[in-house]
Every structure is written in C-alpha cells, then in structure tokens.
Amino acid sequence: MVILKQQPNQLTTIIKRDGRTAMFDEEKIIEAIKKSFQATGEYQNYTYYREICSDVMRVLFERNISVPTVEQVQDMVEEVLMKKGHPHVAKAYILYRAERSRIREMNTRLMQIYEDITFKDSKDSDIKRENANVNGDTAMGTMLKYGSEGAKQYYEMFILKPEHSSAHKDGDIHIHDLDFLTMTTTCCQIDLIKLFKDGFSTGHGALREPKYISSYSALACIAIQSNQNDQHGGQSIANFDYGLALGVKKTFIAQYLDHMIQSLGLIAEYDDAESIKQIHKALLKNGAELSIVNHISFMALELAELKKLGINENLIEKCQQYSLKNAIKSTDRDTYKAMVALVHNLNTMHSRAGAQTPFSSINYGMDTSAEGRIVIKNILLALEAGMGNGETPIFPIHIFRVKEGINFNEGEPNYDLFKLACKVSSKRLFPNFAFVDAPFNLQYYKEGHPETEVAYMGCRTRVMGNVHDPEKEITYGRGNLSFTSINLPRIGIKAQGNIENFFTELDEKIDLCCDQLIERFRIQANKKVRNYPFLMGEGVWIDSENLGPDDTVEEVLKHGTLTMGFIGLAECLIALTGKHHGESAEAQELGIKIVSHMRKRVDEWAQNMKLNFSLIATPAEGLSGRFIKIDNKLYGDIKGVTDKEYYTNSFHVPVYYNTSAFEKINIEAPYHKFTNAGHITYVEMDGDMSKNVDAFEKVIRHMKETGIGYGSINHPVDRDPVCGFTGIIGDKCPGCGRDESEFPFERIRRITGYLVGTLDRFNNAKLAEVRDRVKHNM
C-alpha cells in the first residue's frame, strides 16, 4: 500500500491528443472508472476506484512510461479492469471511451465547419452555397448556417438511431433537412378559400376577410410567408385561380357600384350615393347575383329600385351599360396590378430570420369562370412583364395545369390561356406544366371538385393518394412530412454486376429508410398545435381546425407523406450494365424494374402501417455532390459513375448525353407513374424560344401525350443590367456590345426546380452539372 500511495507523485504530466502536455489529473481517471461501474449497475466506493487508478499508474511506472499519452492511460485502464475481474465494466469503459472520442471528433468537425462559415466567402465555401435560395454571405444567411450545422451534428450524435446516423454519415442514405429533424415538417398545399374565409391571424392581431383583389394578393403573400416560418420546405397555393377569383368577383361588384354612383351623379344628376349603396346591399343580401357573366337579373332589379327614386329609366339603363363596361375594364386593370404586386412581393419579402425569400409555388389554369380567367391571364402577363427593370422573376414558381376539355385543344374554354402560358414560359422559363390527364393524376380527378386536381410543389413534390383516409384523396391542406434518399450508384457499384445482390441490398436500404421515416414521424407526432401557430393554429393543414392549442398533431399529420427518394439511377445502371437508360434498351428495362420495385416496397410499407409512404424522384441540390464525393473516396474514379462532380438527379437521363427532346421525354415518361411523391422531366432547348413558341408548344404537347405528370423546358435567359437587353448573351451583349468585365450579365438558370439569377449561388456540383448540360434538338 505504501508503493500505491507513492505512485501518483511519479506521474506529473500527460500528453493530450493534440500533442500538448498538461498536468496529470488522477481524478479524471477515477471519474471515468466510476461512470463505467455505474453503467453496468455495479457500484463500488471511492476507495476502490482510487485503487484501480493507482494500479494503472503503477503499471505505467513499471513499463517506464513516465509521461504517458491519453491513449496509453485508457489502454491501461481497460487492462487493469480485466485483470481485476471486471470484464463488463471494461466493456462499459470501452464504450464510454468510444463515445467520448465520437463527441470529440464531432466537435472538431463542427468547429472546422464553423470556421469556414465565419471566415470564408460563399464563393470559396461550398457549404455556404448548399442552398442557392440562401445568400450565405449575409449576416442572417450565416446565422442560419451556424444553427443548421450545429443542429445536424447534435441530431447525429444524440437523436438518430445509431444505424440511421451511420448510414447517413457514410453516404448510404441521406436524411433531407436533418437540421429540422425534431422541429417541423416539409411543405403544404395552401387552400386560400378556406384560409381567407372569416379572416386569419399571423400572431399580431386578426386580419379581416379580404374584400378586394389587391387585398387577396397581399394576403396570399402573407399566407405563404407565415406558413414557411412553420415548415422547413416550400409553400404552394393549390387553388390560386379559384381562390383569387373570389377577390376578382368582389372587386367587380365594388367597381360596378362606384361607376353607378359616379355615372348617376353625372348623367342623371342623382347624388345620393348612400341610397344607391343600400339598394345594392339589399339586392346582394337577398341573393341577386352580380358578376361579370351573370348580371342581367341584378340589373333588372336594380333598375326597378332606382326608378322608385324618381330616376329616368333610359338614364338608368345608360348608366348601367356604362358601369358594366367600365367595371369589367377596371377590374381587369386592378387584377393586373395586384398580380404585379404579388410577383414583386414574393421576390422581395423574406422569411426564416430574413435569410430566404419564401420558396413559393402557385397552381392555376383550370378555373373557367370569367373571374378565374382574369386571374390566370393577369398572373401570366405580370410574369411576362418581369420585375422592375425587366428581370425574370425567381418566385413564385408558376405551375399551369393542362387538361383536355379545359385548355389543351382549340375551342376549349381556357385554350387561349394555355397558348399564353406557352408564350410566357418561352420567355421566362415559367410556368411549368402539370398534366391532369396523366393516368396517375386523372384517377383522382372529379369534375367540379378543384381539390381533386393535381397540384405540385415547384421543385416536384406531389401529394394525392391517402391510405390513411381514402375519403380525402385531395391536395388541399396536405404536404410532405419528411423524406430520405437512397444512394443508388453505391448499391450498383457494390453489386459488381450481380443483379440479385443489387436487389438484396436495395431492399435493406428501403427498409432502413422507411424505419428512419417512422422514427422521425414519431418525433413530429408528439408536437402540439401551439408549435405550429399558423400551419395548425390557423387551420391551414387538413383537419387541424378541429384541434386545440395543446392537442398533439399526430392524427392530422397522418394525411401527409413519408417519402423515400433516390438519386443517380443513370450511374447505377452504368455500374451494373456499362450503359445508362438513355443509350441502352436493356438498361432502360432494368431502370424501370428498379424504380417499380422501390414503389412496390413503399406501397407495402404504406399498407402495413396505414401511413402515406411514397416514392419521390429526389430533387438533389447539395446531395448530388455529397454522395459522389464520398463514393469517389471509397471506390476511386469509375468511368461514367464516380469520375465527375455530381450524380444525375433521380431517373433523369444524364445531362451530358446527346439526344432529342422527344426521345428524352419518351425515356423518362415511364418513371413518372412510379414516383407518386413527385417527379419532373426537363428538356434543354437552344436559342431564343420566345421566337419559336410553336416549337415550344410541340414539346409541351408531347409531354402530355406520353404520360408525363409534370414537366418544363429549360432555355437560356440572359439579361444585361446595364442596357436592359434580355435574350441570349454570349461574350458580348447584342444590345450595347459591351462585355461583362465591369458588370456581369445576369444568367437565369434552373436548379432543382427553381430559378437562380446568378451562377455564384450554385454549389460546385451544380456548377459542374450546368457546364455539362447539352441542348436537346427537336
């Protein structure tokens, strides 16, 4: 015992992991030993823990280790615990040691990330360009990244199951929006009609039900902004035309009344405006309809009432015709102004602590009422006009619904609006086109029920089917809860051409993803209405209007989707067969087999759990570079697979592959029916498409005829901010002849569904992808 008491004096310093020396502190060793005993349920007294510590120091001294490293001390603790008959405690100590190492490693990694965020400009930091909709150089953009990266690492360490955490970290799967794991859901299709009825609140006082189209427009922007602050993804208005048509109708009524008051005063010299207002109010209250199309009955009743006031019948009729004509004209003008304001607002207002412009989408095209047509026409004209200096608006993402009988063929009520949509998209890249007649969309459509019309989020997300409640297979008030993507190329590489082995591992990863989605859902389900003051508190999410502030949201969240995605089908097929699906019929057959199998498996999960598991063609932005970077380190350069900076998005034909627009559509169309959580097909066209709208329309028509669910056409949209020229700009501006040495040209390009006005915001992988994009001929 005398020797044991003397040993501590022999060790005075220790070498830490970073190479620095520090004072030797035996109490730290004793504390670690104590925790290891407690972890196994074995308890000893302090004297015994100290005795083990003394044994450790004695062995170090006997081995002539006078200045040990931390690792040497820990090795010796394990050895002494085993010799003293405590194998379980030794195992607990090993786990404790491993956990401490993991925390240290995570801490070091996080600090390195924080250093990049703090001291590097976004052009030198890929992590600050992870999302092109966030300006990583601003104070709020930087703060958002601090919180995001810290949250991700905390969840990896303490919240995720170890198997989910390691699969994500190692690049087998990718848990999207991991920074919001314990907080909220992804996105929602907002029903403006329901939200605006009787008004709503954003937390600082109530907003009345809007009465004019300008108010409808402003409140639509506020709804998008407010809901985005409750969710981590984008926001979409499912019924933009139907919803704002009510505002047009109210505006027409107000305009007609104003013009009647003015004209009766001027022509009939009747100046009692209050009496005219009371007549209108009474007629409307008693059910008389006054609208752009249906006004004859109202005007007859109005005529009778005004005659009672002693006004000449001929003068009344003259005033009515004047008021009708000018009310329609004024309503159209005011609607255009409101749509211009909406476009400007959604490109200038901010959400999420000022770091982002709301990621917004609007769906329209099917409302054939006069008021709905005015909305559709004027939102398209506002988009065509652009921003203040003619710039192409980045938001909202416009989605024009296409359907036979409504707008696809000549003679149909909204055919002129489809033609206008093609014209505007050929200039501004929006709108995109959603095809209601695609079989997997048409199966839900019920005429006269707009809530059954398919609606997409801008990037591609789709919510329609509902195994939780088949009576509510609608778009309104529903959205995605979360999604996780599989690294298909890696499974293809590991299979080494063995298809059976490929599907075996694919099934393992599918089950892993679905299990992770369930874990995340359980966290989300425990949230309360008060955690989502707008989304749930204002009844935006389906059925949430029936809940109180302290109710949990589990039941209503079951209407949402739990989504598995995939990336790199093309590279996966190259790894398995040597060719991708664009260049080989056999590869295409295998590709369809792979994606249909994935859909079959998520459908099984959906039926077993009675939750809406679904499959998405992943819109990878940061992920396209993340997976391939990890795989390149593991497997090196594999031709056509890991020898570039990005994996190809979802089921797309590689961007570098030369093919025609029609052929690309033909190849990708079969995959749309399997990806029920979302999909999109793009083609890249060359030249100024605004000068060849007929060719543009032919491509859109081919998409519809081949069963595409959602599609769009990419083409160059450049602008010189100096002279204002908009079109295709090479090295020099065709408008003024200058180059961009002093002021760069604006080059609008699409990234994972939305537009970006400068390539500076693209991450390295997406920059490489844009460079590789080839044009598709007709």
Sequence positions of predicted segments:
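Metallocofactor- and cofactor-centric catalytic cores in central/energy metabolism, strongly enriched
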Residues: 333-337, 344, 575, 763-770
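Charged, amphipathic alpha-helical regulatory modules used
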Residues: 2-117, 768-774
